[in-house]
Amino acid sequence: MSFLKKSLLLILFLGLVSLSICEEQKREIEEDENENEEERNEASEMKRYAFGYPSGEEKKIKRETEEDENENEEERNEASEMKRYAFGYPSGEEKKIKRETEEDENENEEERNEASEMKRYAFGYPSGEEKKIKRETEEDENENEEERNEGSEMKRYAFGYPSGGAKRMKRKPVEEEENHVAGSKMKRYIFHLMDGEVKKI
């Protein structure tokens, strides 16, 4: 983190140095242009005297006004730069670095996603979409099962079909009746044998 901070400060410092150099070159170019302008003005002044054009004093006043405006613009730019340092507003270079960092993070995220996708294909791990489809399929099956159960319950109420509990209750008395009949048969058989023995004696 400290290395990144130092790198950012170094880049920012180099950017400011480059900016100051550019401003110095711009000022020199403007001075050269002003000198050329003065030379042209002198030539024009001679024409003005000859043809009655406005004097060079008026152009000088206009040029000084433009120079004052340029100086005010530079002062505003310097004040804005000081505000960025004071309040932590990012400069153009910092914004560029931040944007490049975000782009690198997005690329790394895409690479991780591609690597995960390759692992899924290689080892058969279900992707997020497949898990979602499987979960939705299971939910649909559960809903269909519940609907079938509700439909069966409605049929039982409508047509008098016994439910599982009712079938079990109905089957129990039948079993008791069968046991009772079997017991009666055994009793009759025993007493019949005894009656035959008595008659034989």
Swiss-Prot record:
D-allo-isoleucine modifications at: I190
Keywords annotated in UniProt: Amidation, Amphibian defense peptide, Cleavage on pair of basic residues, D-amino acid, Endorphin, Opioid peptide, Repeat, Secreted, Signal
Major localization class: secreted
Tissue expression per record: Expressed by the skin glands.
Similarity annotation: Belongs to the frog skin active peptide (FSAP) family. Dermorphin subfamily.
This protein's record includes keyword Repeat: yes
Pfam families reported for this sequence: FSAP_sig_propep (PF03032)
Region feature Disordered, mapped onto this chain: 26-181
Protein species of origin: Agalychnis dacnicolor (Giant Mexican leaf frog)
Positions of post-translational Serine amide modification: S55, S91, S127, S163
Protein name: Dermorphin peptides
